[in-house]
A protein has these predicted regions:
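Glycine-rich FAD pyrophosphate-binding loop
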Residues: 23-46
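C-terminal segments that line or cap access tunnels to active or ligand-binding sites in enzymes
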Residues: 248-250, 258-402, 413, 420
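Dinucleotide-binding Rossmann-like beta1-alpha1 core, especially the glycine-rich loop
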Residues: 47-125
Length: 432
C-alpha cells in the first residue's frame, strides 16, 4: 500500500511536467504503465535507427513553457525551419495548399483561386466551431480548395463523416490566407511563414524521447510499469495491477478521458454515458530505414486516393542522428476508424507511394521497418463531444480531480500545450 498527496496517471509530457513542478513541494506518484517515460513522446531503437511515434516536433508559443522545454533539453536541441509540402495531381506544391497553389496544374489552380475569391466575397467569417466541416470548408475556402485538398485529406485523417465533424479544432491548425496571399501563392512567389508550425525544435540526439527522458530525470515519484486498473475518486484510492491500493488526496489524469471514466468506480451513469459517446481514430505509423534516399523536405501531405496514407515524413531530416551514416528514416501514417490495418498490404502501398512521389527511389533501399500503433490518436470533434465534456468535467471538478493533456482533456493539441497544462495543473494544487 502507498499513500501520496497527488496521484498522476500517465507519464507522458503532461504528467512529467506536473511532476517536475510538484517535486520537493508535495509527494506524488506518476503511474506510467510502460517501461519508459513519455507515452507517445518516446523513441524506439531498431537496427541503428531511432523511430518516434510519427512526427513529434516542438512548436513553441508561450514564454514560460518554451523556457521550461528548452532548459530541459539544454544544448541537445536543433531549431529548424519547416519544409512541408503537398503532393497532389502528381505534383509537389508547398504547404499550406490554400496559400501555395503554384505547383498545381493550371486548371486546378484556377478552380481553387476563383472558388476562394467567391467564398471570401460572400463573407461569413470562420464561424463558431459548431458548423459541419464539409459545409465550413466550402464556405471558407470555396469549392476548388475544398475538393482538391480539404475534403479528401481530412476524410483520410479523421475517418469520420465530415458532415458530422465540427470545426472547433480548426483555428490553430488550418491556416487562413487573405485573397492577396492566395493569388500571390498561385501566380507569384511562395507564401512563407503561414501556420502554427513554421519553425520548430527537435532534439539533436535521442529522438523526441530525449525530451521525455530529460523531464523524467530527478523525478522521485515516477513509477514505470505501474498500471492503474481502477480509481475511486470519492474514496481517494486507486487499484494498481500486481501492486494493490494507492491512496491519494488529489488526482491528475492524463490517460484518455473515456478510458479514465470507464475505470472510475464512482462515476455516475450520466458521466459514463457521456464518456461512451466520445470518439477517436486510430493511427498506424510505418517507420522505414533506408540506404541513401536523401531528400530535403521534412514532411508531406497526400490528399489523393491513390495514396492510402495521409502523411509521410523524413525523420532523419529533423536530426541526422536518427539514422546511421548514409541512411535516411521515414515515417508513413495511416488512419482507421478503429479497425485493424492490413500491415503487409499497407507496407507495400507505402513503399510504392513513396517511390511514386520521389521520396524513395526503389523498394530495395529499405533495410529496416517498424510498425507503431497509436490506438487513440486524434479525438473526434462532434456534437456529442461538445455535450459530453461539460458533464464529465463537472463531475471531475466536484471530485477535485483534473484531467489534462491531449487525451485527458480530449482535444487536438500539440506537445507544448500538454507541458503547459501539466505545469498549470500542478500550480493549482500548490495554491490550493
Amino acid at each position: 500500500m502507498l499513500k501520496t498527496d497527488v496521484l498522476i496517471i500517465g507519464g507522458g509530457l503532461a504528467g512529467l511536467s506536473a511532476a517536475k513542478a510538484l517535486e520537493g513541494r508535495k509527494s506524488y506518484i506518476v503511474a506510467e504503465r510502460e517501461s519508459r517515460p513519455g507515452g507517445l513522446a518516446s523513441t524506439v531503437s531498431k537496427g541503428g535507427f531511432r523511430f518516434d511515434y510519427s512526427g513529434h516536433l516542438l512548436h513553441l508559443r508561450w514564454p514560460k513553457t518554451s523556457k521550461f522545454i528548452l532548459d530541459a533539453l539544454g544544448p541537445n536541441r536543433l531549431r529548424l525551419r519547416r519544409d512541408a509540402r503537398v503532393y497532389a495531381h502528381s505534383r509537389w506544391t508547398p504547404f499550406p495548399f490554400q496559400a501555395n497553389l503554384s505547383g498545381m496544374p493550371d486548371k486546378v489552380k484556377a478552380e481553387c483561386v476563383s472558388g476562394f475569391l467567391k467564398a471570401w466575397n460572400a463573407g461569413g467569417g470562420r464561424g463558431d466551431g459548431t458548423e459541419p466541416f464539409s459545409r465550413w470548408t466550402r464556405r471558407v475556402f470555396g469549392d476548388g480548395i475544398s475538393r482538391h485538398f480539404m475534403l479528401p485529406y481530412n476524410a483520410k485523417l479523421w475517418r469520420y463523416p465530415l458532415g458530422r465533424l465540427t470545426t472547433e479544432w480548426c483555428a490553430p491548425f488550418v491556416p487562413m490566407p487573405s485573397p492577396e496571399e492566395v493569388v500571390e501563392g498561385a501566380y507569384g512567389r511562395r507564401t512563407e511563414g503561414m501556420g502554427y508550425n513554421t519553425c520548430f525544435y527537435y532534439p539533436k540526439r535521442g529522438g523526441i524521447g530525449a525530451l521525455s527522458n530529460a523531464l523524467a530525470m530527478g523525478s522521485s515519484g515516477l513509477r514505470l510499469g505501474l498500471e492503474v486498473e481502477s480509481v475511486d475518486l470519492k474514496k481517494g484510492v486507486a487499484q494498481v495491477r500486481h501492486f494493490g491500493p494507492v491512496y491519494f488526496k488529489r488526482l491528475i489524469n492524463t490517460s484518455p478521458l473515456n478510458d479514465f471514466v470507464a475505470m472510475s468506480a464512482d462515476a455516475p451513469a450520466a458521466v459514463r454515458r457521456a464518456a461512451a459517446s466520445l470518439r477517436h481514430n486510430t493511427v498506424y505509423v510505418l517507420n522505414l530505414g533506408a540506404r541513401g534516399a536523401r531528400r530535403d523536405l521534412h514532411w508531406a501531405y497526400f490528399p489523393g486516393p491513390e495514396f492510402p496514407f495521409y502523411r509521410a515524413g523524413i525523420a532523419s531530416n529533423f536530426s541526422a542522428a536518427l539514422a546511421p551514416r548514409g541512411c535516411s528514416s521515414f515515417y508513413v501514417e495511416f488512419a482507421t476508424a478503429g479497425e485493424a490495418l492490413d500491415l503487409a498490404s499497407a507496407e507495400k502501398a507505402a513503399v510504392k507511394g513513396l517511390a511514386a512521389c520521389g521520396m524513395l527511389d526503389r523498394a530495395s533501399q529499405v533495410t529496416e521497418r517498424l510498425w507503431l500503433k497509436i490506438p487513440c490518436a486524434y479525438v473526434v470533434y462532434n456534437r456529442e463531444r461538445a455535450a459530453a465534456l461539460p458533464v464529465i468535467n463537472g463531475w471531475l471538478k466536484a471530485r477535485r480531480a483534473q484531467s489534462i493533456g491531449r487525451y485527458g482533456a480530449w482535444k487536438y493539441s500539440f506537445m507544448e500545450e500538454s507541458v503547459k497544462e501539466g505545469l498549470e495543473a500542478a500550480g493549482r494544487l500548490l495554491r490550493a
